[in-house]
């Protein structure tokens, strides 16, 4: 099931124009009754009301037929010329637009935290979204890709490097990368493909009016993490302790941990934070979890955990631990996955890029909040670790991996 993006204000989630094109059909003697052409717009067109009528011309009986015939011929001739002119203009417009688009070479910068192979599904999704809107690599599009290879400290330099490439827009995701891009430029537009909480992270002023040079989409990670913990408790109801695997280097982790702690207290769970800053920390983290006798693990959303989902899922399976995290985590072998489709969000980022390239200020484009969340249960993993998933949870699942 795909992602549904709900605009906070002003635009349709699909990105399609809500207005309609209305041609002047009541022009007489060169004077339009209600205006010539209304172009497409993202705001509804004004109510045009009913068709405007205009008074009949009174003529004397003498010579009326001849006068009407003469005037009718003149008007019909004028209408024909206007019709041909409008038709020619409409037929020619796509060609002109295409020529302009072809002439302009668009340069998009992509700033990624993980390596290029790990990030490939996201960049492919962005390319597909841009292609749908007429931006094609090798024709009118250049994508400048920069990867920090999982090292947050490299992000600032890579962002500056993209600015040096004279990119028209930067597309990125994750609080550390977004902050690096914001520090590198106050003028080049930045599109957030996905982030846990754009407002709490101090990335935008508000969802309706982001401000500055930033716009994009958010999915509110704190609420997701709390729900993941709840689902984990439902799956292993006798568990009293849960290890929370998180990246302490992520500056946006605070609100998520607060939400998890509140959910843990409500569920009467003892939570223990286990920090992982790099992939090399994974084995040590799980050794610590086993020593402390935790039987369940919550994997908190972070670029380090998202792009190393399989390694984490393998360790949880190896130690027969019930675990929950984001969708990709369950797909990689974790027990439970709940969240948004991040790949779909990267494809949606093309919509924001297109609006910016058409002249709209990034800070004036409302942020979108992901409103569609999927539940994925890995039944194969449940059988392997000896966990019986509650039938009601299976019925609620959007997808069950057998």
Predicted regions and their residues:
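Short hydrophobic alpha-helices and adjacent helix-cap/hinge residues
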Residues: 1-402
